[in-house]
């Protein structure tokens, strides 16, 4: 199993949980296209970067909406990575970025990754946040999707998530 981005579960609700994610480094590309196209187009240069530099694959693969048909796709770098010792990519589209600590509301769902399934679960999570009086941080494109499994894994075993940054003071 791949190393996963480090977090602590702060609170569990019936249908989602609040997590405190540790700071991390990511390799990221910006991609134009539909949600599904962006996931495919963005994966290749990131996979080439880690493969060419002998960097372990981690989970999840993160996809963030920028605006209509524009996305950021990222791989989390292994724990212990330091921006000063990660190689510079030969592909100028791949950027290494530091992501700060943050609280996220996370909703898990299984199956194949599709726009309809993503939209449904995003709406479920947003409704749950309203129900629990938890405030989102950012605008309507503040969410990110997280895919944890390789494409060849049977769909009923695949783990996906919607993650929304939240204010958490409890």
Map each language-model feature to its residues.
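A solvent-exposed interaction/effector surface
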Residues: 1-170
